[in-house]
Amino acid sequence: MADRKIYELEAMRDLSRIWLHVDMDAFYASVETLSNESLKGKPMAVGGMSMISTANYEARKYGVRAAMPGFIGKKLCPELIFVPPDFKKYTYYSDLTRKVFQEYDFDFVAASLDEAYLDITDVCNERGVSGGQIAEEVRGRVFEDTGLTCSAGVAPNRLLAKICSDINKPNGKFVLTNDQLAVVTFVSSLPIRKISGIGKVTESILKDALGIKTCDQIINKAALLYALFSPCSADFFISVGLGIGGMNSLETRTRKSISHERTFSPTNYEASLFKYLGK
C-alpha cells in the first residue's frame, strides 16, 4: 500500500508553477527601529516581561526568541530593551508591502502581516525572466517603499518556497529550480521540523518513537506511517517527504486574528482584578 501511495502522490507533483514566499525580517522589531533610530544596533524585543512578540537580530544572538517570556529574555540579555507593540503601525507597513505584492500577483496569499505567497508564474513568462530575478525585484521594491528588508524563497510550490525563504535570512533569497531531481535532493536531507505543519509535538512523535528525523526517512518508513496513522495524516507526511506538500493550490483567504493580552502585576486585591475583568 505504501509504495502505491508514494507512486500516486508522486504523479501529482506539479513543476509548472513558480511560487515566491516573502518573509519580512524581524518585522515588528524592524518597524520599531525604523520609527526610532536610537534602537539601531541594540538588542530589542517587541513585547514585555510577560511575553515577547518578536526580537531583533541583535537580541537573537543572546538566544532571545519570539513567544518567550520577557523575564527569561532579560536574563539571557540584561541589556534587552522592550518596546510595546503598536499594531496600527505594523498594519500600515504591511499594507505598503501588499501593494507591491499585488503588482506581481493580484491574488497573492497573505499568511500574516509579515509574510505572503505569490504565484509569479505568469509574470515570469510574460517578461521572460526567472523567479530569482522577480524575487530580487520584489525585495528591492519592498525596501524602496518601506525601508524594511525581507527574505525570499522561490520554488515550485508554497511549502518549498517557505522553506527556501528561511535559508539566507536575513535580507537574502534562495531559489530552488523547477526540476524533480533538484527538488528531491533538496528535500531529502531536510530536518522534519523545517516542514510547515509539523510542530514540536508531531516532531517528537516522529523522532523519538519512530526514529524519523529527515524527510528521506519519512519515505523510507512510509509503510510504518500508514500502519500507525490515519490515511489522511500518512498522506500528508509522505507528500511533504516528497516535497509536494499539498500547499501549491490557491486557498480561500480568511482574515486572521491578532491576539492581545495583558498580564496583571502581583496584587493582594482580588476585587480590583474582577472589577477590571468586568469591563
Language-model features and meaning:
Residues 1-113, 117, 241:
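Residues that scaffold, gate, or flank divalent-cation-dependent active/transport sites
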Residues 21-22, 152, 198:
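Short hydrophobic beta-strand that contains or immediately precedes a catalytic carboxylate
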Residues 31-33, 55-58, 160-168, 208, ...:
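Short acidic, glycine/serine/threonine-rich loops at helix termini
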Residues 57, 66-79, 96-99, 134, ...:
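Intrinsically disordered, low-complexity, Ser/Thr/Glu/Asp/Lys/Arg-enriched terminal regions and linkers
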Residues 64, 183-214, 239:
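Amphipathic, charged-and-aliphatic alpha-helical interface segments
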Residues 95, 99-150:
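Hydrophobic alpha-helical hairpins/lids featuring a short glycine-rich hinge
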Residues 130-193:
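Long, highly charged, low-complexity intrinsically disordered interaction regions
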Residues 202-279:
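DNA-contacting surface of Y-family translesion DNA polymerases
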